[in-house]
Curated annotation (Swiss-Prot):
Gene that this sequence comes from: glgC
InterPro entries, per the entry: ADP-Glc_PPase, ADP_Glu_pyroP_CS, GlgC_bac, GlmU/GlgC-like_hexapep, NTP_transferase_dom, Nucleotide-diphossugar_trans, Trimer_LpxA-like_sf
Function: Involved in the biosynthesis of ADP-glucose, a building block required for the elongation reactions to produce glycogen. Catalyzes the reaction between ATP and alpha-D-glucose 1-phosphate (G1P) to produce pyrophosphate and ADP-Glc.
PROSITE patterns, per the entry: ADP_GLC_PYROPHOSPH_1, ADP_GLC_PYROPHOSPH_2, ADP_GLC_PYROPHOSPH_3
Listed GO MF terms: ATP binding; glucose-1-phosphate adenylyltransferase activity
Residues where alpha-D-glucose 1-phosphate binds: 164, 179-180, 197
E.C. number: 2.7.7.27
CDD domains named among the record's database cross-references: ADP_Glucose_PP, LbH_G1P_AT_C
Official protein name in the record: Glucose-1-phosphate adenylyltransferase
Lineage of the organism: Bacteria, Bacillati, Actinomycetota, Actinomycetes, Mycobacteriales
Highest taxon of source: Bacteria
Biological processes annotated in GO: glycogen biosynthetic process
Native organism: Corynebacterium glutamicum (strain ATCC 13032 / DSM 20300 / JCM 1318 / BCRC 11384 / CCUG 27702 / LMG 3730 / NBRC 12168 / NCIMB 10025 / NRRL B-2784 / 534)
Family: Belongs to the bacterial/plant glucose-1-phosphate adenylyltransferase family.
Amino acid sequence: MKGRPNVLAIVLAGGEGKRLFPLTEDRAKPAVPFGGTYRLIDFVLSNLVNSGFLKIAVLTQYKSHSLDRHISLSWNVSGPTGQYIASVPAQQRLGKRWFTGSADAILQSLNLISDEKPDYVIVFGADHVYRMDPSQMLDEHIASGRAVSVAGIRVPREEATAFGCIQSDVDGNITEFLEKPADPPGTPDDPDMTYASMGNYIFTTEALIQALKDDENNENSDHDMGGDIIPYFVSRNDAHVYDFSGNIVPGATERDKGYWRDVGTIDAFYECHMDLISVHPIFNLYNSEWPIHTTSEGNLPPAKFVRGGIAQSSMVSSGSIISAGTVRNSVLSNNVVVEEGATVEGAVLMPGVRIGKGAVVRHAILDKNVVVRDGELIGVDQVRDAQRFKVSAGGVVVVGKNQVV
């Protein structure tokens, strides 16, 4: 857009991610590796950067070392025009306490807003997999004249009970914001679909500051953006829904247009990986017109297949070696080794994993640097797996970081 206003983007990256345990045992949820070479936070940061928003504060808290390191190594966009992507930990500016909720995180970081003096503040989550052009949402927010716009994705009503749900009128004004309702509202044009909140918001700055200060003094508040701040604006008839289905990203196909996944559970995380590996994937990582950025792999050699090693319907990242082993329907991160006679099927292997000779790994997620001994079986005997590892409701076996099994 011409004459773009001053915008500050705040990414909420302090999530603990308990439902992704043990993948979050030693790292914040946005730092969890994803898709072979990425981390979850790379998706929101790529969307913002590709859209031209280059003043970004990433608010961190929970076990943030690997996240902070990733941002400093992969996202150095500083320049003479004041652009930056900065990791901002909890600083206890309002007393000796950590962030008590997502709204409190922004309240404690109001100095960032004071320094930048933005016209609008983008507040996005850090742990979803999707492509989006936020500038289109900003344009619609400005045109709406409302204090806040909430990105909504259309989902079938029967699936919407797990989300914050938006009821709106035909003009996009939000009339009610419901947290995980038993009977989700339909959209104005389709009673069988519901607007689920994506956790992405754009605020007019003055209105956001006032809402945060009012919320601070509310003893009954949980200080949560979705649970408290958005209803605050809805009650004042000052909230607008942005229909994500209208967001057109360059290079998107009809197959992956509107793709958005909340990967907050092991099963959702696993299924999202499986979305990547079909011939015509539901979510296409190879869209060069709207790339997902991350650390360069320039110092790693290409993946190598030797002694008859094969990979079918899989993604195999740089530095990996398949030596007389077989990989099917799987996603392998950097520096994975699959040895002679080993079989990996329907698995997600994170960096540095070693699969020993004759071992079998099926329907599993193996975190960084896991070593599977020769002849070991994972994902074959559910009873034995449950005695040793976490097994999700969908039967996905998860082996935590640095284990030798």
